[in-house]
A protein has these predicted regions:
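GST-like domain detector, emphasizing the conserved glutathione-binding G-site
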Residues: 1-130, 134, 148
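Active-site-flanking alpha-helical
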Residues: 75, 163-164, 205
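GST-like fold's C-terminal all-alpha helical module
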Residues: 98, 102-197
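Terminal-tail/helix-coil boundary detector
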Residues: 203-210
Length: 210
């Protein structure tokens, strides 16, 4: 029985798991849930994830949630190449640290963006959000080694890219001033372009973004 993957279009956390599943070639049944329809609040989904959030998976009766934990589970369950995490202990520790940094610090800056582009957002909030995000992304410039973050294509790339793709989409649609003059550095901007052209990214592009 194929793994069941519960996703919602546009969620950067669900998107990273979708990217990982496709990258590793893991057979799965995609269940695209709707925030607006209340799909995450149904008794059936709540039994899988009591927190009523995506992503979540069910593998042979084993329910699991939280995107970072799912990524590690996928590599443990299917240790074949391509891997999401390095087999080298130090490289793997670095990847895990970077994912935690994204989930804490990039997510915090992303929250400011959400507030700034909301209906009650102000020009000052946009400026503050741009400053916070730019300062955070500047820390990621040195992390780019070659074409991807932390070396080869990995869980780190699948974590950061969906977050930034969402930020840029919101900015383009609601607050262009947020990205006027650039938000990411030269290396990170080039990395985003490379990521966008990857077949795995194109295949998993959020349906309602197309």
């Amino acid at each position: 029985m194929a793994l069941q993957f519960y996703c919602a279009s546009g969620s950067p956390y669900a998107w990273r798991v979708w990217l990982a599943l496709e990258h590793k070639g893991i057979a799965h049944d995609l269940e695209m849930l709707s925030f607006d329809a209340g799909d995450l609040e149904t008794p059936a989904f709540t039994a899988i994830n009591p927190r009523q959030r995506v992503p979540a998976i069910v593998d042979d009766g084993f329910a699991h949630y939280e995107s970072g934990a799912i990524l590690e589970y996928l590599d443990d369950r299917w240790p074949r190449e391509p891997r999401l995490f390095s087999t080298d202990i130090h490289a793997r520790a670095l990847q895990r640290r970077m994912i935690q940094e994204a989930d804490q610090y990039v997510a915090e800056a992303m929250g400011r963006v959400f507030n700034a582009v909301g209906e009650s957002g102000t020009p000052d909030q946009v400026a503050e959000a741009k400053k916070a995000m730019s300062e955070e992304l500047a820390r990621w410039e040195p992390a780019i080694a070659g074409d991807f973050l932390a070396g080869a294509l990995s869980a780190v790339d699948f974590t950061l890219y969906p977050m930034l793709a969402l930020v840029y989409r919101l900015a383009e649609r609601r607050a262009p001033a947020l990205i006027d003059g650039g938000l990411a550095g030269t290396k990170l901007g080039a990395w985003m372009q490379r990521m966008k052209t990857l077949p795995v990214v194109q295949k998993t592009w959020p349906p309602h973004w197309k």
